[in-house]
Amino acid sequence: MQATWMRTLARVLLLSAAIGITTGVSAQSAEPHQAILMYKGVDRDKRLLEKARQEGTVSVYTSLAPTEAKPIVEAFEAKYGIKVEMWRGQSEGVVQRVLSEARGKRHAVDVIETNGPEMESLAREQVLSEFHSPYFADLPADVIPKHRQWIPDRLNFYVVAYNTRKVRREDIPTTYEGFLDPKWKGRISLEANDSEWMGGVINTWGQARGMDFFRRLSELKPELRKGHILLMQLVASGEADVALGAYYANAASTKQRGGPVDWVPVEPVIARPQGIGIARNAPRPHAALLFTDFMLSPQAQGMLASMGRGPASKAVKSDTTALKYVMSQPSVILDEADKWLQLWEKLFMGK
């Protein structure tokens, strides 16, 4: 689902660029809230809070799970006395709603929070604004886009998840190539459209090594399961012994709930940023910036870590802090989506 959507999104953006269709903001050279969002004076925080409280509310569109979004919203409201109006959908729904409203010149949303590639697509459509936050200093330099129109607030890691009743941790290989051993045949499951993970591995290893691995993996005929959540449920139930390219967040949260699941950072660990940004025409820019600051702060980052999410901030310790990983670039994911999906379908789906 995610890979197919990413290919569709990439094609739509390419077509828009080719024929000059945009959200209608490209002709505006200056961002309307630039003075607010880029202010770095010593009174920044005091002034921002005063103005945000005058605005009273902030509208947030996110794909963060309700069980994780709700406590963060409650913490923000309790701290600042500002009401959060939250709309939640799948990542594609968030993008579609933002673009539809922008093209209709209906400026309702202040803050957008979803997957990195989707955030990058919104930046290309010029519906986001560059902004500054003092919490940028807590982020790894390689995760911050040069345009700074969106900033990573959490990281998703592709790992190996396994059922602890059927697989011993010490039996998990240290690299993905170890799963080519015939003893794993019939025990491996993959998400049905995980071409993004495949592209990250191939780009890390190089064409020769990466292509050879996925060709040989496809010959083992791994089980394909549609959706990362379903994939993790099957691992927990014992229907799948191991899942390659599983989402760390799904494995960690399942483990926290007492499921017989654990995860291993098998090399190469591919990381993908999830991001937050401020709408170019945000009706409440001060509240938008205050909420974005909060999401990047140690308080909210610590909450994400406690819920099994990978915090983007280096100021917060979590069980992903010591991971050695390769950061995928959302711009590359968008540009290469079609290529990797075609290869995935050829290898694993016989298309």
Predicted regions and their residues:
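A ligand-binding cleft/hinge motif common to bilobed small-molecule-binding domains
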Residues: E118-S121, D241-P260
